[in-house]
Amino acid sequence: MVNQQWQWQKAPAQPVQPAQPKGFSRTASPVASTLQALRQQGRPAFIGYFPYGFPDVPTSLEAMRVMVKSGVDILEIGLPYSDPVMDGPVIQAASKCAIDNGVKVEGVFDAVRQVQADGARALVMSYWNLILHHGVADFARRMAEAGGSGLVTPDLIVDESGEWIEQSDRYGLDRVYLVSPDSTDARLQLTSRAARGFVYATSRMGVTGERTSMSNSAQNLVARVRHAGAPYVCVGIGVSTAQQASQVGAYADGVIVGSALVHCLLDDEGRPRKDRRKALEALAEICSDLRWGISQARK
């Protein structure tokens, strides 16, 4: 662990607002208000991902609590899906474990409440078919009631988002869409206009996972997305070290880390680690390291 002392202050989480009349959204985006507060502090956000129900529900909730205590500002709570084609092997293994344990979509709202109560923003990251199956309107309502900030939808494009835009506007929820270097300028403009909270920039549309080196494609993409009109752009490109987090944080509004965190609870064969205490200690350590790296991004 990096033996550096750093001080930081979380942006205060906001209580959920009542549903607005159809077609009207709250003026302020929940996540954007946090990103704005952090920008004023001179640092990017630390955005961490963890799948609900992995390796079991109680441990996943404990892991999320550890992440928030160790410096995560915004937590993406993953909904396990049976065909996670855009996820790498680490998150695929974690999702399979959660599904095998019988995790249910309805339980994610308990995780949202906990993360919100612990002082971080809670986003749910989900493949769109899960939301459709649950019911878009009901999911939006329950998400808002739980204090959640919105959804990250990796496989949903703006053109097919009519019902989600309607319901997220009704309940004041954020809409986070993904873009890649392959996205056209017209696509970036359309996405930037429709998104609320931030636009999620990836190194490429496809499988996620940890990387040993960073390319400059994400930095170029961030510049293009800003030019397209997005006020906040956060980057997820397989960051796994404090140095990488600092590099990405120098140009992004938020650094998104997923596989490296989930990996802490998996053994070398892709199975849940038996010693949960040590696994959670490892999670706390890497979160602290990454948080320190992010704190150095603009110094």
What role is predicted for each listed range?
Residues 2-12, 20-49, 112-113, 298:
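N-terminal amphipathic alpha-helix/helix-capping segment at the start of soluble metabolic enzymes
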Residues 20-26, 223-231, 240-299:
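Alpha/beta catalytic cores of nucleotide-metabolism and tRNA/nucleoside-modifying enzymes
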Residues 26-38, 57, 81-93, 100-113, ...:
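Active-site-adjacent beta->alpha loops and helix N-cap segments on the catalytic face
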Residues 46-62, 123-135, 174-183, 211:
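Active-site mouth loops of central-metabolism enzymes
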Residues 48, 67, 78, 143, ...:
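Conserved, mostly hydrophobic/aromatic
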Residues 58-67, 183-193, 235, 239-255:
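Catalytic cores of alpha/beta
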Residues 73-82, 148-152, 157, 199-209, ...:
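Glycine-rich phosphate-binding active-site loops on the catalytic face of alpha/beta enzymes
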Residues 88-123, 166-180, 216-233, 281-299:
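Alpha-helix-loop-beta-strand connector modules within alpha/beta enzyme cores
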